[in-house]
């Protein structure tokens, strides 16, 4: 019955304190350190009372609901409960007690809180149920055609829905093998893992695939076992998609669209979709879900017209944790999740994302969608990645700026 609160390992002390306090976390499980972060030192600074109080009976001034910290290190500092001791406590719980607790759970209860980007203020805790994430992981796996013979390499973070739901739960619900190539993304290790493990599927965001495609040693690895995977998490450049299919043998690679608040996937291309659809759209609405495109007044727009994308169904979160106002702003009374993304839908139901509503550039009264310009830049063979933004301009209101990353050897 415990609710898992996913925490970004890159958080600094202030961000960690906010999430722990806002969610009301009672227990925290932590590694001792990772990369440049010393988590033990960070927690000792946030909770100086740790060293002087009994484990499990913590009373912290800054984090009043926190009762203890569990460390994955074998010999953590005083006040931290070692993981090895925690697992030993299971012997004090009877099978009858376990079954009683299991029987008390309901599929619609919260099981996971994932904090979304704080670009519009403090991060909000998207609260997801068993029903949300188990079904979404299953549906993603169904679209990929996963089975017990598949071996999925998961280099994406497990604290995000991409790794946790689309990766872990997608595999668990289909009997597929989960493979983690490294503790943090490394393009060389990921390619080596695919080759050594004869992986059939691979996940990644576009920048990950770009890094793997540009890895100088890529030709040394046999990637012919790959057949499918997902590129998601950000706009998927057309040229990158073509290279993944042609150079990494991922003939059935799919695009998935969604957000943390929708568990996460709402739309996905299918294995039978032709290349044109997979590189120009994010697919069609998943089974058991609904999508619509609306104008600023909330009215449906004609097919092919750009408006805000909204989705509804089993995948929509329970709400933002302890944030009823934020929940009401995101989910309307009819249950539609307002994504904030601009999109259009064709006659066959395929959706094309034009960009974020707030990212649209208005230059001299003209609406300009960064995605369209980015796709044009990607047609140049020297361009590895590009981001288009608008900046204030006294003459036109906004002016267009493009940040471009070149492939090695180009300028």
Task: Give, region by region, the residue ranges found by the protein language model.
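Conserved pre-ATP/AMP-binding loop-to-beta segment of ANL
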Residues: 62-66, 70-71, 76-77, 81-115, ...
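Gly/Ser/Thr-rich phosphate-binding loop
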Residues: 87-88, 176, 196-204, 213-277, ...
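Structural core segment of the AMP-binding/adenylate-forming
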Residues: 2-85, 408
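AMP-binding/adenylate-forming catalytic core of the ANL superfamily
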Residues: 11-21, 28-32, 202, 297, ...
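Conserved AMP-binding/adenylation subdomain of ANL enzymes
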Residues: 134-151, 161-201, 215
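ATP-dependent adenylate-forming carboxylate-activation enzymes
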Residues: 2-21, 32-38, 176-197, 208, ...
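Conserved helix-loop-beta element of the AMP-binding
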Residues: 24-27, 48-70, 151-153, 179, ...
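Conserved structural elements of the adenylate-forming
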Residues: 93-96, 107, 112, 126-147, ...
């Amino acid at each position: 019955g415990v609710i898992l609160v996913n925490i970004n390992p890159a958080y600094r002390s202030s961000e960690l304190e906010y999430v722990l306090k806002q969610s009301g976390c009672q227990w925290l499980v932590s590694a001792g350190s990772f990369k440049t972060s010393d988590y033990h030192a960070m927690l000792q600074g946030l909770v100086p009372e740790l060293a002087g109080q009994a484990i499990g009976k913590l009373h912290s001034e800054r984090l009043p609901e926190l009762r203890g910290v569990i460390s994955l290190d074998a010999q953590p500092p005083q006040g931290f409960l070692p993981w090895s001791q925690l697992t030993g406590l299971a012997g004090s719980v009877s099978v009858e007690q376990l079954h009683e607790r299991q029987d008390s759970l309901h599929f619609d209860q919260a099981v996971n809180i994932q904090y979304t980007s704080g670009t519009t203020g403090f991060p909000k805790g998207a609260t997801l149920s068993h029903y949300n994430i188990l079904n979404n992981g299953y549906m993603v796996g169904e679209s990929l055609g996963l089975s017990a013979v598949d071996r999925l390499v998961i280099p994406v973070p497990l604290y995000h829905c991409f790794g946790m739901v689309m990766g872990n739960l997608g595999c668990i619900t289909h009997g597929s093998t989960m493979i983690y190539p490294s503790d943090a993304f490394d393009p060389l290790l990921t390619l080596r893992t695919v080759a050594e493990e004869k992986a059939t599927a691979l996940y990644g965001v576009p920048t990950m695939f770009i890094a793997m495609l540009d890895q100088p040693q890529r030709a040394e690895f046999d990637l012919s076992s790959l057949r499918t995977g997902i590129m998601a998490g950000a706009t998927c450049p057309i040229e990158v998609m073509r290279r993944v299919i042609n150079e990494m043998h991922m003939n059935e690679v799919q695009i998935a669209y969604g957000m943390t608040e929708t568990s996460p996937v709402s739309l996905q291309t299918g294995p039978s979709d032709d290349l044109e659809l997979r590189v120009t759209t994010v697919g069609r609405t998943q089974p058991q879900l609904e999508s619509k495109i609306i104008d600023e007044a909330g009215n449906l727009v004609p097919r092919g017209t750009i408006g805000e994308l909204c989705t509804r169904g089993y995948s929509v979160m329970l709400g933002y944790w302890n944030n009823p106002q934020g929940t009401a702003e995101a989910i309307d009374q009819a249950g539609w999740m307002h994504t904030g993304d601009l999109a259009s839908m064709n006659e066959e139901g395929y959706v094309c994302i034009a960009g974020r509503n707030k990212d649209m550039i208005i230059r001299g009264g003209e609406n300009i969608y960064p995605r369209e310009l980015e796709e044009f830049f990607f047609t140049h063979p020297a361009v590895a990645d590009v981001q288009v933004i608008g900046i204030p301009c006294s003459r036109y209101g906004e002016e267009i700026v493009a940040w471009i990353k070149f492939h090695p050897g180009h300028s």
